[in-house]
Amino acid sequence: MSTEHPSRAAGRGRPPSLRDVADRAQVSHQTVSRVINDFLAVRPMTRERVLAAIDELGYRRNNAARTLVTRRSGLIGVIAVGSFLFGPTSTLAAIQEAARKNGYMPLLATLRENSQAALIEAVDEVLDHGIEALVVIASRESMGRRTAELRPGVPVIVVGPNPAEADDLATLSVDQSAGATAAIEHLAGLGHRRVVLLAGPQDWVDAQQRLTAAQRCCDDHGIVSQVLLGDWSAASGFAAGRALLAQWAADHSGPLPTAVFAANDHMALGLLAAFHAAGVEVPADISVVGFDDIAGADYFIPPLTTIRQNFDALGHQVLLATLSALAGETVDLTPAPAQLCVRSSTAPPRA
């Protein structure tokens, strides 16, 4: 009869791994990770089966996982949807830089799709490395709601909206509403009373907040506004510009809009290209305001008036909130500021 230790038998001369436990319990390795890290979204019977397999195999968590208990791994998990858009990438870069400056190593996991399954998979991935805290960049409202449903056993900071069902969730963002309001206030101060609002996709929280604030400010100033939808791309801005020009050519019954507020700089770039191709002068014929202050916005033709997001301040606030959560303290979470940058794409409307 063999007297081989079960851990050696399972591992064939090596310590048993997480996958060995998964095979013995007939579950996925992600489920084993959730049990090890006290993730609540595991059925009791499944949890018992995994714990039994751990005991039978003599499985021991590796050093990285054990640091979760002592909170000394120096790792902060960061989850984001894979995107090359300016806002999400700038947010990610700011968080990574702030983490490094404070002696932490950011561990990034990108979502393959915007779904609960993909979010859980990403959470499992970073938990396996023994993170101390988790930062989720929730660009879409649905991702904020899904994050609220998770209780991974470590502090969670959401960069994005605060879901109504999770008032206890720490959330941070750039003040999108203040930025959009500043853009419309600028146009109102120049004397514009007919403004087109080129909004981003409405499943993005930033796009919703910018549009809502812009519409409210237009109403406050008695500005007549028209909403068009884009998809953040310069191509959608160009298409919107072409559509506006076609509308103006077909409808001579009323005054034309004198300004456009685009919800990001890429769409503003597309607008400028469409107007230039049609011989419409900016800002003599129409003013254009963007949002983001992307690299090169001051080299657009003409240089773009836009809203600058303070991502450095956002990254600092995320780290402050994370460190406070790790210390069991609360911190006053205020939106990072947004700043109006006035350049040459805006001017008073023609009389």
Task: Describe the predicted segments one by one.
Residues 24, 31-34, 68-84, 94, ...:
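Short beta-strand segments enriched in small/hydrophobic residues
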Residues 11, 246-351:
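Flexible loop/turn connectors
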